[in-house]
Curated annotation (Swiss-Prot):
GO terms for cellular component: cytosol. Glycerol binds at residues 81-82, 133, 240-241. Pathway: Polyol metabolism; glycerol degradation via glycerol kinase pathway; sn-glycerol 3-phosphate from glycerol: step 1/1. This is Glycerol kinase. ADP binds at residues 11, 15, 262, 305, 407. It catalyses: glycerol + ATP = sn-glycerol 3-phosphate + ADP + H(+). ATP binds at residues 11-13, 262, 305, 309, 407. The lineage of its organism: Bacteria, Pseudomonadati, Pseudomonadota, Alphaproteobacteria, Rhodobacterales. It is an enzyme of class 2 (transferase).
Length: 492
């Protein structure tokens, strides 16, 4: 029997998922790792711990199924995007902890570049905005801050990579320094129109181009690893949100998916032509196959599932995320408590890194149920913000059905609330492991085990469709209250 091994390296855990030749999940292993918060607004990971947990989960699923390396046709990697690692080319040791996508320490660098009139240049080439979210200013910070790092980088002694690139380097024993187009497109240094690193942008950031990985298709040869008992090829790579877009089979222009994990990330396929957003969305690469780039509009929300984690860990009003829907359903419908969950700033379409969370509409009767309802509704309202922006950029032909995945999509209450606040149907697929499936399909398709795009799209199956039940007048009044709350939070 033939298998595909998917590595899903996320923000809070490393996972390995083994798929069989029919794209069925047969085994999963997961290890959480430590989150480091050395200062307010800073988030770091130990890249060595990421590496160790990744190897451990891979070995666990392989051993658990009792299979040999010759039965694994390929490895597909998907990863948290933007998170930045700089490591020693000779020994492979990181020179600093990985700076996570959520980290806001480079806000001042972004502001200086913005004041210098550089943002239009960045956006024109990369499709991105000047924000600490992206990798470029994180690399600059490491080179400027770690003693000797800038000189070593100039001498060609240091390498940069997002998590995929670091894992590929380690898996191949340092033989391959490469990334894929979707991860490169999130660095703030990649020209998404030319499909190459931008010399001009790298000069603005003072990042030597010798540090940068080679950029390849999402389904390509990324070398082989011998860490699992024999030679196994690495054949697929995509950033987590792009992998979910692939896993949701959003291959046609106008199709849209939204993934609900720690944050929420919505992508709308725009086909082979990039669409420049007029609503402060991101223009990015959805996937690149056979040298052909397919583009997307993306909206990034920093806090989605993390709001539910706050209910559990910060307020202690639930013991686990699965309880959130039932508690929210008990909220007083006469109350209009609104949470603006700007715990790490606001993402699209506002891009306010200094904004902080706020709650509005509290009364003496507001309690755990109302707080829980407000947290879940905040995710729906933020998705509505992205929905409106994407409709504005793409036009009337945008798909009126949203495909959803991620942990929060398992909640019927939350998904019904999402449909109500969007005023549009929400589709949840049978296969919820869309991110891992996307990575597995890339590797399996490259290996000749899995079908082509059309064949893969035909396997997508609906679990549940949530249709709007909210009266339109009530929906629009509630959305106006949300917009007013966001405006107030940004003024504090």
């Amino acid at each position: 029997m033939t298998f595909i091994l998917a590595i899903d390296q996320g923000t809070t855990s490393s996972r390995a998922i083994l798929f069989d030749g029919e794209m069925r999940r047969v085994a999963t292993a997961q290890r959480e790792f430590t989150q480091h918060f050395p200062e307010a607004g800073w988030v770091e990971h130990d890249a060595e711990e990421i590496w160790q947990t990744t190897v451990e989960v891979c070995r666990e699923v392989i051993a658990g199924q009792g299979i040999g390396p010759e039965q694994i046709a390929g490895i597909g990697i998907t990863n948290q995007r933007e998170t930045t690692v700089v490591w020693d080319k000779a020994g492979g040791a990181p020179v600093h902890r990985a700076i996570v996508w959520q980290d806001r320490r480079t806000a001042a660098i972004c502001e200086r570049l913005r004041h210098a009139g550089c943002e239009d240049d960045f956006t024109a080439q990369t499709g991105l905005l000047l924000d600490p979210y992206f990798s470029g200013t994180k690399v600059k910070w490491i080179l400027d801050t770690v003693p000797g790092a800038r000189d070593r980088a100039a001498a060609g002694e240091l390498l940069f990579g997002t998590i995929d690139s670091f894992l590929i380097w380690r898996l191949t024993g340092g033989r391959v320094h490469a990334s894929d187009a979707t991860n490169a497109a999130r660095t703030l240094m990649f020209d998404i129109h030319q499909g190459e690193w931008s010399k001009d942008i790298c000069e603005l950031l003072d990042v030597p181009m010798s540090m940068l990985p080679e950029v390849r298709d999402c389904a390509a040869d990324f070398g082989t690893t011998d860490l699992f008992g024999g030679q196994v090829p690495i054949l697929g790579v995509a950033g987590d949100q792009q992998a979910a877009t692939i896993g949701q089979a959003c291959f046609q222009p106008g199709m849209m998916k939204s993934t609900y994990g720690t944050g929420c990330f919505a992508l709308l396929n725009t086909g082979t032509q990039p669409v420049a957003s007029q609503n402060r969305l991101l223009t990015t690469i959805a996937y690149q196959l056979d040298g052909q780039r397919t583009y997307a509009l993306e909206g990034s929300i920093f806090i989605a599932g993390a709001a539910v984690q706050w209910l559990r860990d910060g307020l202690g009003i639930i013991e686990n995320a699965a309880q959130s829907g039932a508690l929210a359903a008990r909220a007083d419908p006469a109350q209009n408590v609104i949470l603006v969950p700007a715990f790490t700033g606001l993402g699209a379409p506002y891009w306010k890194p200094d904004c902080r969370g706020a709650m509005f509409g509290l009364t003496r009767n507001s309690g755990p149920a109302e707080f829980c309802k407000a947290a879940l509704e905040s995710v729906a309202y933020q998705t509505r913000d992205l929905w409106e922006a994407m409709q504005g950029d793409w036009g009337a032909d945008a798909d009126v059905i949203l495909r959803v995945d991620g942990g929060m999509s398992a909640s019927d209450w939350a998904m019904q609330g999402l449909a109500d606040r969007l005023g549009a149907p929400v589709d949840r697929p049978v296969m919820q492991e869309t991110t891992a499936l996307g990575a597995a399909w890339l590797a399996g398709m490259r290996a000749g085990v899995y079908p082509d795009q059309a064949g893969f799209a035909a396997t997508w199956a609906l679990d549940a469709r949530f249709t709007p039940k909210m009266v339109e007048g009530d929906r629009e009044a509630a959305y106006r209250r949300w917009k007013a709350a966001v405006a107030a939070a940004m003024m504090v």
